[in-house]
């Protein structure tokens, strides 16, 4: 059974960093990078020592500002993502060849994401694109049932897999 978000539940999930400090191929150091999260389903490191995290109904940016390996700053980047079926909430975080941040949402989720540029709505599945410098969010592709895999080829073309549609690999282009 997938975890469901219970009203009033206290966030208790963590992001843990495992390290192999002695080079034997086994993790021997464990550091809690972030805690008090609620069903984090994706993590995307940035180039400044921080990370974007899918934290249930929101995308947050976590930063380690003092270099101790632990997030000590948390900023909500986008909020308003649906949580009706938690195994379909935000996932598959990745950087695109255009420098934008891409992520997926699956079916049975109803989102009204609040952005500085207005509300973006997605009722069901799709692929999102976020410009992290302007916080402009847009839906670039819709129609897959459960888009879990997403990638770009060397020419910047976008492809996604559908975990439930049986269609294999799909060309996911803007407006599709």
Q: Can you name each region flagged by the protein language model?
A:
Residues 1-176:
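Beta-propeller blade termini and top-face loops
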